[in-house]
Amino acid sequence: MKLALEKFFALKAHNTNIQKEILAGITTFITMAYIIFVNPQMMAQSGMDYGAIFVGTCLAAAFACLFMGLYANWPVGLAPGMGLNAFFTYTVVGEMGYSWEIALGAVFIAGILFFIMSITPLRRWMLDSIPLNLRIAMGAGVGLFIGFIGLKNGGIIVANGATFLSLGDFTNPSTLLAGLGFLLISILSIRKIPGAIIIGILAVTLMSIFLNLIEFDGIFALPPDVTPVLMELDILGALDVTMISVIVSFLFVNLFDTAGTLFGVATRANLVEESGDIKDLDKALKVDSSSSVFGSFLGCAPVTSYVESSAGIEAGGRTGMTAVVVGILFLLATFLSPLAAVVPAYATAGALIYVAILMLSGMESLNWDDQSELLPALIMVVMIPLTFSIANGIALGFLAYVSIKVFVGEISKISSGAWFLTLIFVAKFIFL
């Protein structure tokens, strides 16, 4: 068995061993396990069955991780993506009024398009043709979107008729616990303690139990029935022309998020070859895109590679065996449904705020010297949360980019990809 594992994953060639890979897998799982609490809680607000989406989240993540490990041999964990799950629930279903079945159909279509791009030159064309500042702005804008939801769920900000928003009531135990959860996660992360986010979520949940704010129903149980969301996607409904901007948003946010994560992980895991090419990048992208398709069958928003995988790589993970361990742990997590169900929304608020802040870190790489590049990016970052729509924020960013470039005499610098997306967004605003 040991020799078979060493041969299959090429452990010696990657200067690692079974013990290191198992430890790395456990480390990665601990750092990203918060998704099994956050994702069902968020997706259930779209009308989906909580227990079913809990199991769907675990199964989608398990499939993706096992596929990544066994096919691509990358030490990367995958799960339904943060940000896109919020877009799914609050914008596509909540604001735009589509059913969650149609929204899942859009996830499926975006996944198919992503897969096609990953096996054709379209991927390189699109990655190269979208301005770097706008790619960075997408991630940062989604971060602010997540942070806004976290602040709202924690009661830290509340609606105000006179000023739109105001500070929440910190004499309310749930609001206070949400703030304490964020502080705890931040402190543990700064001290480099693995699993800081999930520790913060569970700590707030435990305090809530002691304060009799919630009822505790146990930790383990047989997995809930997944059939209420299984294969319930409405693909034909998602083919409506009004869904184009939604599909584009799912596609490109996932594409750039995945590309950024994989490029970063490849460097840390020594997967960059002497030629500068990344080893088996095409396989990793195929896994990511096909996992989104599979996840849509289980009621999930687009599945994506997690930057938290870097924690496992720091622990010594170098091969797909790390991802396989993560996948097995996600399968075992299906038995934690009672614990997941008892976690209150304010317990995950701190996690959302913390993840949001991490997503803003990419803004340091913006080109702050060229205002024709900077201003459209900042418009995108600001308008995603303020319009409460990733699709509208991205659209306004591209419209601003092309408009500014045209009128400052830099039309030749506008790439074909930027023109293509801008025309789609113009059509959206005029005809839809």
Model-identified regions with their sequence ranges:
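Helix-loop-helix hairpins and the membrane-proximal interhelical loops
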Residues: 1-52, 166-167, 198-282, 423-427
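Helix-loop-helix junctions within the multi-pass membrane cores of secondary transporters/permeases
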Residues: 2-35, 39, 60, 80-139, ...
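Helix-coil boundary and interhelical linker segments in multi-pass alpha-helical membrane proteins
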Residues: 41-52, 91-102, 241-244, 344, ...
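Loop-to-helix transition at the N-terminal end of transmembrane alpha-helices
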Residues: 47-66
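Transmembrane alpha-helix interface/packing and boundary motifs in multi-pass membrane proteins
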Residues: 64-77, 186-192, 250-257, 288-298, ...
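Conserved, well-structured core segments that form the ligand-binding/active-site neighborhood
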Residues: 75, 205, 209, 316
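Membrane-embedded alpha-helical modules
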Residues: 96-210, 214, 324-432
